Amino acid sequence: MELDPVTLAVVQNGLQQVCNEMDLAFVRAAFSPVISEALDRSDGIYHRDTGELIAQGELGLPVFVGTMQFSTQAVIARAAKAKPGDVYIVNDPYLGGTHLMDVKFVKPFFYRGRLFAWLANTGHWPDIGGMVPGGFSANATEVEQECLRLPPVRLYKEGVLDEEILSIILSNIRIADQRIGDIKPQAAAPTIGEKSLTALL
């Protein structure tokens, strides 16, 4: 299929705008200053089957957009029965992560009843457990000492937050009452992206 330059530019900018809207929704609602002020986050759109990057916004950190590709691929490998409204959480550095405090949310995007793409974001959480606040310790000798490590797990099931999984996460991190102020905006951002991408298509 061939695209003329004008159509290509319209599609490219439309997809970029979807990512920007996700990013702005996340940063405006996030509780943590490291996300809302230091802007340590990013959003992207990924291929339905391969998990490869399709589009990224102008506002987030480019390094996250690249590593989210591998996290999205890890989700795809484990999410054979993804449904609308599902949101997966992952921070495992061995599955395409950076460090453990960079938590990824990955959501399947359905269009006309079929899986069409994946929407993903990364946010740096101030703490996700481990032997010291913030996760960085010169005395750590293994990854288990650094932070709680999450393989791809479905945190939202068909739009409903799994309170049991949430309680496991919050029970293993400091200032847990503040993290819900990042979790909900981070999960809501791809929902904003869904609406924008549907309108674009």
Model-predicted segments: where are they?
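Short, small/polar residue-rich loop motifs at catalytic or cofactor-binding pockets
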Residues: 37-41, 101-103
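N-terminal leader/propeptide and maturation segments of large enzyme subunits in energy/redox metabolism
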Residues: 1-11, 149-201
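Short, basic/aromatic recognition patches
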Residues: 14-38, 76-80, 89-96
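A short, hydrophobic, proline-anchored segment that marks a local hinge/packing element in signaling
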Residues: 102-112, 120
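Regulatory sensory and allosteric helical modules in signal-transduction proteins
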Residues: 48-56, 69-92
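A short, polar/charged loop-to-alpha-helix boundary motif
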Residues: 61-74, 126-135
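Gly/Pro-rich active-site capping loops and adjacent beta-alpha segments
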Residues: 115-172
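Generic short beta-strand
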Residues: 43-44, 107
